[in-house]
């Protein structure tokens, strides 16, 4: 499984879910952090998209919205990605949905922080 991209998002997490989510990205998705400091991790993908994880003490002064954030990981093999996140202890939500006319498939999962994320594959 290869992760091909995501859109930029910043997510604020309590310390325990911060660590678990960072571990999921590094160990399961094999994404190395471009920046990894106390309470902050920046993941920069080859296509230029970024994900920033913040623990509460590292949030910028201007803060972030209090509402939930969801985004999708574009992967090259949605079946392998589904198996990998499930093996990492994440809950798969629903079945893989295939939209043949768009050559697009997707599935959601609940990450270690309790948020819903997506997996998507474009052929």
For each predicted feature, which ranges?
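N-terminal beta-strand motif that seeds the catalytic metal site of vicinal oxygen chelate
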Residues: 1-22, 69-71, 123
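Vicinal oxygen chelate
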Residues: 1-7, 86-123
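Short amphipathic alpha-helices within nucleic acid-binding modules
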Residues: 19, 79-84
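Conserved active-site tyrosine of GNAT-family acetyltransferases
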Residues: 21-26, 85, 114
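Residue-level marker for the onset of beta-strands and adjacent loop->beta junctions
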Residues: 29, 39, 69, 81, ...
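Short secondary-structure junctions
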Residues: 30-36, 91-96
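Conserved short beta-strand elements that form part of the metal-binding/catalytic scaffold
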Residues: 31-66, 116-122
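Short hydrophobic/aromatic beta-strand element in the GNAT-like acyltransferase core
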Residues: 42, 50, 72, 106-108
């Amino acid at each position: 499984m290869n992760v091909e991209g995501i859109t930029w998002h910043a997510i604020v997490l309590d310390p325990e879910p911060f660590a678990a989510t960072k571990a999921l990205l590094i160990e399961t998705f094999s994404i190395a952090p471009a920046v990894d400091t106390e309470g902050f991790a920046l993941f920069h993908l080859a296509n230029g998209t970024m994900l920033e994880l913040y623990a509460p003490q590292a949030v910028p002064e201007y803060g972030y919205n209090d509402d939930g954030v969801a985004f999708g990981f574009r992967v090259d093999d949605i079946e392998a990605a589904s198996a990998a996140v499930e093996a990492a202890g994440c809950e798969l939500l629903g079945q893989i949905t295939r939209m043949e006319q768009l050559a697009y498939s997707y599935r959601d999962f609940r990450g270690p922080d309790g948020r819903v994320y997506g997996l998507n594959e474009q052929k």
